[in-house]
Amino acid sequence: MITKLIPKKVFFTSGAGTHPEKLESFEAALRDACIEKFNLVTVSSILPPRCEIVTKEEGLKELSPGEIVFCVMSRISSNDPGKTLTSSVGCALPVDISKHGYISEYHAYEESAQDAGAHAVKLAESMYSTWTKEEPLKTFSIPRSSTVKDSGDWMTVISAAVFVI
């Protein structure tokens, strides 16, 4: 029997990590965001109809280590000392909960978390509005920013919308 994989819940998280190895800086960012125990599969930008937004703590309780978990993720890495890295996901909630909303991902160098968050919201809002011809019910973002240390170690910054099926 084939079942549809339509998420019922979503939570938002972010993290930053540093390490001499790029891959391990990504792992450290996942740990900081509390999503390192899952096999993450990135998906595009649709917030399913009737998808409930829950806290990170509530969402994590419903997931198991090793589980394949779908997410919308913004990710940026660098080992350039002093460079600021910023990631954000933005969300546009539908006016009618029987319709879908949008989640955007955005990342940039040398941009504040506030500016990246505003840009992610603008993207999600634009995708929603061009489809519905109306403003979303609500918008928000989960931005994260960090600066590469002088050691030249790799820094990775992530923001994610994590789905619970």
From Swiss-Prot:
One of its GO terms (molecular function) is arginine decarboxylase activity. Its cofactor is pyruvate. It comes from the Archaea. The modification Pyruvic acid (Ser) is found at S45. It comes from Methanosarcina mazei (strain ATCC BAA-159 / DSM 3647 / Goe1 / Go1 / JCM 11833 / OCM 88) (Methanosarcina frisia). It catalyses: L-arginine + H(+) = agmatine + CO2. Pfam families: PvlArgDC. This is Pyruvoyl-dependent arginine decarboxylase 1. The gene is pdaD1. The record marks S44, S45 as: Cleavage (non-hydrolytic). The lineage of its organism: Archaea, Methanobacteriati, Methanobacteriota, Stenosarchaea group, Methanomicrobia. Its EC number is 4.1.1.19.
